[in-house]
């Protein structure tokens, strides 16, 4: 089926467009966005569409980024379409919290939402294709995602007040490249897409080709089909979850203060089928945090273990700056706030650190940001609030806790190890502050005491293949959420 007909059929099947819609088209200059623009331009007269091109110049590739912007400007002039280009300052994405990929994505959608509000657009179209879908499913499978994650990229979704549509999601990358050749379209090629620095690129360049070579060309279609099937089943699970929420006495409050709170009966929650109970916890965290992403399996499991307690009062800090409080079987999910100092329970807790991602730890008054970075980018001198680690040398997953008896580190300039207690005394850390210090650990090994000492064994060197940059920031008193 010709690409134009395939896109037309896909758009109709998923209800992506209405006659007379004003549509923002995200254009990078690559083959996907170029084909998307060309196809929508051809479909526009029949549906009376008003197209408005959008380009985000990330400023990450110097002259190549400027050439991309100029290419898109030429395309807009050739098609007589309006264009909005947003140019970011050098280092702007790197300064944001989270990974570079996630930051670029969030900024792109935020800018498109602003543009939509300014021009009255109803939709924004992006060039995601069937290969992107397969890569997403594979990436999330390797991360251990559930059905929601494995449902992949949705054809239509609401994001930040804007409806995002993906008209090319039913087409393969090969079809798109063939379309560009057939219509004399010469796209820009982003060299970073050919580098193995990012997780998705490794899947695109190494893992998926190896699977295709071993199991045939149907691998991409089969992975994308899996996403389609799971998306339908996920819709059913979502409906069953809403019914289970009602059975558990789900109640939302706090809208007037801008700090949403979810309350429910924990004794009823733990009686639900495990699949539904997990989804209820994830939904509660998403409602309170406002994030599209829920907590991982480990955090959800700990939340359910706590929710079933019927004696006394307990609490647990979850990702996205949400705290679960349980009092005699009643659960309350709310924004977490820093305390004046950690209590006895906080001193016994361990907070897993999301990599990449950001973890708020109100009990210790800190926020921990972690991202994967190229080892070669490490500066000669690190700020006091920053730590770089050789990912392959870490003895376990990263987490934050307070000190424990027997903690030791290997300081720079010393042959062996030294007790943390002695290190804190030598550093003149006040006695009343020592128990509340946040420690970055890998497994049960202390790798960093922010502002005090770093363990030399995990510092990246010439042989490092993958590095993690961790930043610890103090949270202003009274702040909440993320």
Swiss-Prot record:
Signal peptide: none
List of residues binding ATP: 28-33
Subcellular location: Cytoplasm
Keywords (A to Z) from UniProt: ATP-binding, Cytoplasm, Ligase, Nucleotide-binding, tRNA processing
Protein EC: 6.3.4.19
Superkingdom of the organism of origin: Bacteria
Catalysis performed (reactions): cytidine(34) in tRNA(Ile2) + L-lysine + ATP = lysidine(34) in tRNA(Ile2) + AMP + diphosphate + H(+)
GO CC annotations on file: cytoplasm
Gene Ontology biological process: tRNA modification
Entry-linked Pfam families: ATP_bind_3, TilS_C
Keyword Ligase recorded: yes
Gene Ontology molecular function: any one: tRNA(Ile)-lysidine synthase activity
Family: Belongs to the tRNA(Ile)-lysidine synthase family.
The record's note on its domains: The N-terminal region contains the highly conserved SGGXDS motif, predicted to be a P-loop motif involved in ATP binding.
Function: Ligates lysine onto the cytidine present at position 34 of the AUA codon-specific tRNA(Ile) that contains the anticodon CAU, in an ATP-dependent manner. Cytidine is converted to lysidine, thus changing the amino acid specificity of the tRNA from methionine to isoleucine.
Name listed for the protein in its UniProt record: tRNA(Ile)-lysidine synthase
């Amino acid at each position: 089926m010709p690409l134009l007909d395939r896109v037309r059929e896909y758009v109709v099947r998923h209800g992506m467009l209405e006659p007379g819609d004003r549509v923002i088209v995200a254009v990078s200059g690559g083959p996907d966005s170029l084909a998307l623009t060309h196809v929508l331009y051809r479909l526009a007269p029949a549906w009376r569409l008003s197209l408005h091109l959008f380009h985000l110049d990330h400023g990450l590739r110097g002259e190549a980024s400027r050439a991309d912007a100029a290419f898109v400007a030429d395309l807009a002039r050739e098609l007589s379409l309006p264009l909005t280009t947003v140019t970011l300052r050098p280092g702007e994405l790197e300064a944001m919290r989270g990974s570079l990929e996630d930051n670029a994505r969030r900024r792109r959608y935020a800018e498109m939402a602003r543009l939509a509000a300014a021009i009255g657009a109803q939709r924004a179209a992006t060039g995601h294709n069937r290969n992107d879908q397969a890569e997403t499913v594979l990436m999330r499978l390797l991360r251990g995602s559930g059905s929601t994650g494995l449902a992949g990229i949705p054809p239509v979704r609401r994001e930040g007040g804007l409806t995002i549509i993906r008209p090319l999601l039913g087409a393969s990358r090969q079809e798109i490249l063939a379309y560009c050749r057939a219509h004399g379209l010469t796209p820009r090629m982003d060299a970073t897409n050919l580098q193995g620095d990012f997780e998705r690129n490794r899947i695109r360049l190494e893992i998926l080709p190896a699977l295709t070579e071993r199991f045939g060309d149907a691998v991409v279609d089969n992975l994308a089909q899996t996403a389609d099937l799971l998306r339908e089943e996920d819709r059913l699970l979502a409906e069953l979850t809403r019914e289970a929420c009602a059975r558990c006495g789900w109640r939302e409050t706090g809208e007037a203060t801008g700090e949403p709170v979810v309350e429910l009966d924990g004794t009823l929650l733990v009686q639900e089928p495990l699949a539904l109970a997990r989804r209820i916890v994830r939904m509660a965290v998403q409602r309170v945090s406002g994030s599209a992403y829920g907590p991982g399996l480990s955090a959800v499991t700990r939340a359910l273990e706590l929710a079933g307690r019927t004696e006394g009062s307990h609490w647990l800090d979850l990702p996205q700056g949400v705290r679960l409080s349980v009092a005699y079987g009643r659960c309350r999910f709310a924004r977490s706030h820093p305390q004046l100092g950690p209590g006895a329970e906080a001193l016994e807790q361990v907070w897993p650190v999301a990599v990449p991602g950001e973890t708020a730890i109100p009990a210790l008054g800190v926020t921990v940001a972690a991202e994967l970075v190229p080892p070669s980018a490490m500066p000669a001198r690190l700020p006091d609030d920053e730590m770089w680690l050789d990912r392959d040398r870490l003895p376990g997953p990263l987490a934050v806790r307070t000190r424990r008896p027997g903690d030791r580190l290997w300081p720079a300039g010393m042959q062996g190890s030294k007790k943390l207690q002695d290190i804190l005394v030598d550093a003149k850390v006040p006695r009343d502050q020592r128990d509340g210090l946040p420690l970055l650990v890998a497994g049960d090994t202390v790798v960093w005491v922010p502002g005090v000492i770093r363990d030399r064994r995990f510092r990246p060197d010439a042989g490092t293949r993958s590095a993690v940059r961790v930043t610890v920031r103090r949270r202003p008193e009274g702040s909440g959420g993320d």
